[in-house]
Amino acid sequence: GDVLAAKDPHGHYRPASTLKALTAITLIPKLDKKRVVRPSPEACNEEGSAVGLVPKPIYTVEDLFRALLMVSGNDAANALAEANGGMRKTLAEMNQVARRLQAYDTVAKTPSGLDRPGQRSSAYDLALIARAGLAMPGFRRYVSTKVAKFPAPKGHYEIANHNRLLGRYQGMIGVKNGWTSKALGSFVGAATRNGHTIIVVIMRHPGWFWDEVADLLDWGFAVRGKVTPVGTLVPPLSETPSPSPAPVQALPAAPAAPAVPPAAQAPAPAVRSSGERSPMAFAVPAAGGALALVGLLAAYRLRR
């Protein structure tokens, strides 16, 4: 996919719960969605956002993925990691998947996205991760579900997707939002119109970002094919025709960035080292197909 606009796309930021997208694309191919899981008390008592798990064998893997991607359950993230053989194994596999996607800015330290020293991602990498997820029917189904029934010890209750644009923005597919006091607001999402998909990523946003996401998507659909791309999303390593060289964090400056809407213009200089002083980083990749996400060749290729 072509990158239509970007600010500090490889800057390192805390991903918060957007990292759950990486958890999902790592585990969806591995876990039987009908398998019944009994979460540990430790998983059920994880801090932060939770779906409300109890240590009883009443949940399927499918239930846990809904809880992970719809309501950002940190308890569900840990329960899925347990079902996969444990935290250490799951984190190692998440980082392997990131390397395969050439998401070299990303280091996962938790399956939930809760802040940990050294955990990081970038707007560019979250776009790579979202693209990989959208190619998975299961992932696409989970992130686009508005409301679902969730098991309880006696019966069930309803959970509703945290994506405020789902069902309100034309063509919105979904993906994942996140927030912590250190990461601030983050979002990676996708919308499809007339067979074309736009992915938008915002990181370290200080406030309400939903209107800005809608503005960015509007702009992306309006200018697609009319502006010179500033880069392109690299393919996964398995799709590259020859072995990739040792990864480097290349971020060539585009000679002329395309015009962007006011919502896409960051008010402060980007700081690539930690992201602490940059209030926003985003990338707007475009693709030619809703599933394959293939775009035109970019004028400036971001090589790693």
Q: Could you tell me what each predicted segment is?
A:
Residues 2-124, 128-137:
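Active-site-adjacent loops and short helices of periplasmic peptidoglycan-processing enzymes
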